[in-house]
Amino acid sequence: MAQAEFSLQEKDKKRLIKDRLVRLAVTSGGVGVLAALILIFVYLAMVIIPLFSDAEIKPNHVTRTTQVGMPLAISVDDYSQLAFVLTQSGEIQYLSMDAPDKPAIYTQQLATNPVSFSQSAPGLGWYGLVDDQGLAHIFKPEFNATLRENTRPPEVVALSTDMNLTLTNAQDPVTQFVFSASTQTPTIVWQTRSGKVKARWQEKSALGVAPTTIDFSFSAGFDAPQQMLLTPDGETLYLRDGSELIVLTKAAQKFTVREVIDLTQGDKKHSVRTIDLLAGAYSLLVTHNDGRVSQWFDTLQNDKRTLTHIRDFKLASELKYLLPDSHRKGFYSFYTNGTLQSHYTTSEKLVLFKRAYKQAPAMAAMSNNEHYLITWNDDSLKVAEVDNSYPEVSLSSLWQKVWYEGYPEPEFVWQSTSASDNFEAKFSLVPIAFGTIKAAMFAMLFSVPLAVLGAIYTAYFMSPRMRRVVKPSIELMEALPTVIIGFLAGLWFAPIVEDHLITVVVMLFVLPLSTMVMGGLWALIPQSLRNRLPNGWHALVLMPVILLLIGIGVWISPSIEQTFFGGDMRLFLTNHGIGFDQRNSLVVGLAMGFAVIPTIFTIAEDAIFSVPKHLSDGSLALGATPWQTLIYVVLLTASPGIFSAIMMGLGRAVGETMIVLMATGNTPLMDWNILEGLRSLSATIAVELPESEVGSSHYRLLFLAALILFVFTFAVNALAELVRQRLRDKYRAL
């Protein structure tokens, strides 16, 4: 007996050890899953956080002295190794920044006795001098890299044109001029000491004939402007007279006044100090004497282009001058006390604020890659290293409407790439987040009724024999790859919807309504006839009726289209301002709903079928009808599982990639129109991440999109579990 008790104790110890090992394994698995989720979140956050960091500057990265006096222009190469200085005498000197004591490595006299200087819009690198004889010299200093010799031999490229560059004579010298250095149609506008403003340009001729040179003299009303700016294409000229701006455009071989604008907008305390072109020359930066900087660009109003005030930057009155970025839509502001600020116009973000100098430099310029800022003051050149990688990103630019260049009003826009170096990045996450919600909503609108109602019928009403066929068949649908579903939806189903739109619309309304009507008619059939059909086989009788209704719908659709839509439903919708795309939200909703139905159906059906039999039997025994038992007993008991099924389907729909990618036009639209396309977060990540530059704003924003998807899915699942637990506790007593 004692030996038997000892044996039982041994078994209890083994069982206890096994229980502890299994408990440890299960706990470790759960903790491992949570740890993996936390690591994913931390990694995504580490990639995203730099987007919202401030810019940094190292003011004295490289320094060297010069003996040329106040220069006309300065610049530095993309490696801060070579700089040039354009002197007042018209000589350009290339200086090595690596060897501060070394004399100029290359010099060239570009003009003799220059009397006027000008430079092109930011980022283009063209400069111009007019000598005392009225001859214009337009050139572009370059830093050419020769890797084989490990040197960067400088080169000054002159404008190649056969246009006469002699603008005036010595008796009436040029006081200011502007130019566009297009090799096809260069344009020069100048003002002489007498105050006259003239222009000269070349226009292309047809059939290969040499370009025609055109001289144009402005009328007396344009005499002596204080400042002139010309866009790089030579088509738009700005003349500033005090705080008044005259906008002229080139047409019919002359400049004509498009509009005259009061830059103070009626407030005299905002008098204008100077104007500058932003990179790309689409925007105008107006510096006011009170330190305010305003941005203006052309918008389309009443079918006419007009220069419109867009936004203001309230800077201090100690502002000395602005320096626009070379390619991006930002600018640097220099103050008399040496403070340096940098703003980005699109995001309205202050990206840099630092007391970088003892006093404001007399002159400043940016390298072409915008990594180095060169300044001149007191015969000293200083190069500062600038780390300003993500100026275009701010919370407001991501989630609020932004007024982009050329747009008539503020909008939500996602456009990450362009062929232009001066492209204004449009990084609003709202359109792609909206597209994600839109796709998920239409998918759930299609899948939830079919899946939940199908699960109810299969689990509660269907005969066991039919259930053994139907349930595995629907579960088998989940094994279909979504890429195949998306492929069929985009290349096969979308053209069918386009060609038979009216038929699809009719079916969406006719099938649900006719099914309910058939249910009502079935109740009118005598009980003796209904009893001949075994319980659970009603769906089999409904199938021929559905096929018949589909045939009738296809047959009457052309008549409906002819009667109500003038014979072409797509044209009718277009004429009434409703857009139509072949790959649209309707196709996505049907295709993605097809993919989501098995998930919702399986979980909901299992929840309903698992309701204890004694609950429904007790309800029926107390006199309740099967329908009352279903509503008040079965569905209440199974409601936690049904809710979880719907939330799981929602999570699947939100994260779906291939169906949305292949079945839509992938266009980031902000429209609830079911007949237009969309772009989702997941599809954007799949398409753009392989082509994005690692570490760029675009790259990190795609990780932010991934984090949004991750957090949303986690929140949906957490909410589903919370609601499921509460519903289970509420109906536990049933």
Provide a role label for each language-model segment.
Residues 13-20, 51-90, 94-123, 128-130, ...:
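Periplasmic/extracellular loop-to-transmembrane helix junction in inner-membrane transport proteins
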Residues 89-95, 133-140, 148, 192-203, ...:
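Structural motif
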Residues 426-440, 494-514, 532-599:
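Loop-to-helix entry region at the N-terminal start of transmembrane alpha-helices
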Residues 443-474, 518-527, 720-729:
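Transmembrane-helix boundary motif in ABC transporter permease subunits
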Residues 517-528, 605, 609, 613, ...:
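C-terminal transmembrane helix and the adjacent membrane-cytosol boundary/short C-terminal tail
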Residues 600-603, 611, 626-661:
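Transmembrane alpha-helices
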Residues 660-710:
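Interhelical loop and adjacent transmembrane-helix boundary motif
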